[in-house]
Amino acid sequence: MAVTMADITKLRKMTGAGMMDCKNALTDAEGDFDKAMKIIREKGQAVAAKRSDREASEGCVLVKVEEGFGAIIALKCETDFVAQNADFVKLTQDILDAAVANKCKTLEEVLALPMGDATVAQAVTDRTGITGEKMELDGYMVLEGATIAAYNHMNRNGLCTMVAFNKKVDEQLAKQVAMQVAAMNPIAVDEDGVSEEVKQKEIEVAVEKTKVEQVQKAVEAALKKANINPAHVDSEDHMESNMAKGWITAEDVAKAKEIIATVSAEKAANMPEQMIQNIAKGRLAKFLKEVCLLNQEDIMDAKKTVREVLKEADPELKVVDFKRFTLRAE
């Protein structure tokens, strides 16, 4: 039977596939819409299989809050061109709407949700067949709370955050905290949310860094005392190039190497342990100030911390939790 433009348009609305794909599917299915949809779906599965090893680094990230339940989801693809496509954004929004309406707690639950005559997982595969790009759902996060603030950074669908509070909060203040999470990327609400493993690792790194700095200071002081510029002998390459320039002599280099070896060994063997630990603890405190939301300088008023801003608004107001997802490596 002849395929009409009306039939092609109808199938396109049903599947989102291109006009030529719809025409070919209807032709192969001899006008049977169910068979045509199956053909398009099978094409999507075939394309998805071929694209499975490709990297999907672009996409659309959206956030939604409804009746004390919030969720972030990302539908990823290969190119920004597809990510900006209205149908792609709509599919992401439709999936998020369904996830929030059903209060899904996991990505697996989202993928199993019904969508049209299939599932969310199948809808994503179908879209792969239409665009020819690998697609996958990622970054599904949920929050529940008395009040949840949501923020889509600059409405560009690339970075979204949610913040849950223990009670009703001023809308502008809530958005400000959600923006803080987007801008400053904290890893925990406060120190209690940072694992002991992370704290211990930071202490170990700080101790080693401090020891290296103490040795370096001692070496530089000894070199200066010997009338040798530390910058001229801080590496083998510098020693050679600076000798070639006539800035130092071979005797200077030999003397510098002896000083570096001797002073480094002596300083390492006589390191003031208590001082090292104190400096390391100070560096841990600085780290916790930078990565804990409540300890951070407020993005709207650097003279105050987020904790102070919240306390001024309401002494009983607390941040319960937050979520953040971005497509970009940071």
Curated annotation (Swiss-Prot):
Keyword Cytoplasm assigned: yes
State the protein's name.
Elongation factor Ts
Q: Where in the cell is it found?
A: Cytoplasm
PROSITE patterns xref list: EF_TS_1, EF_TS_2
Recite the UniProt keywords alphabetically.
Cytoplasm, Elongation factor, Protein biosynthesis
Q: From the UniProt record, report the name of the gene that encodes this protein.
A: tsf
Give the Gene Ontology MF terms in alphabetical order.
Answer: translation elongation factor activity
| Highest taxon above the source species | Bacteria
